[in-house]
Amino acid sequence: MTPILISGFSVAVPVAIATDLLFATISKVLGVAIHGRAGRVDWKVTRALWSGSLPGVLVGSLVLVGLVTQGATNWLMWLIVVFVALTGWTLLRRGFQAPVTMRASQAPAPRWLAPLGGAGIGLGVSLTSVGAGVLGMALLVRISPRDTQPQRLVATDLLHAIPVAMIAGISYTFSGLVDWGLLGTLLLGSLPGVVVGSLLSGRVPGRVMSLALGIILVGLAVVLPLT
C-alpha cells in the first residue's frame, strides 16, 4: 500500500510508511483469525522467525524515527523502490516456477536461517512497510517442511507479520507520523476484502495471483522514482 499512497495520493513517505504499517496490522489480524480458527498456523516456525524479526523491527523503528527527527528521509524513497522491486521479482519468480520444483530439491534449512532472515525482514519492513508478506513467504517456503500445505504457509506468514507491523506502527504513532483519517478510509474499503480473500484462499490459482501482483509491483518500482 505504501507505494500507492506515495505515487497515487502524494502522501509523504514517512507518513505513508507509518499509516500502512498500522493498516497492515489490523487487516492481518482479521485474516489470521480466520486461518487460525482452522488450525493452520505453524507456531514453531513462527517463533523462530520472531526471534529475529522482532529485534530487527525495533532497531529499524528507532532508525526511522531518528531520521525523521533530523529531516534526513530522502533516501527512504529509494529503499522502498528496492524493496518493492525485490518483492515483485519474488512474486514473478514464484509465478513462473512450478510448485513441485520449488520444494523437490530443497535441502533442510540451517537453524540460523529463520532468525537471520526474520531480522532482515523486520529491519526492512520497519523502514519501508514493504515485503513482510511476500519476502516472509519466500523464507517460509525455504525453512518449512516439504509437505507443508500452502494454507498453512499463508496462515503462518500472516501471524508472523502481525507483531512486526504492530511494533513499528505503535512506534510511529507516538512519533505523530500516522494519518488517522487516511487509515480509517483504507480500513473501510479493505476489511470486507480481507474477509472474502481469507475465505477464498486456495481457490484462486496461486501462480496467477503471483504473476499479477508481481507485474503490478515491478511497475510501481519503475513509477515511484518519477513521482
Write out the residue ranges for each language-model feature:
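Membrane-interface alpha-helices at helix entry/exit sites of multi-pass transporters
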Residues: V11-L22, D42-A48, P145-L158
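Structural signal for alpha-helical transmembrane segments and their flanking helix-loop junctions
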Residues: R111-S171
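Membrane-embedded alpha-helical segments of transport systems
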Residues: L22-G31, S53-V59, V63, L159-I167
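Extracytoplasmic
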Residues: M1-T2, G133
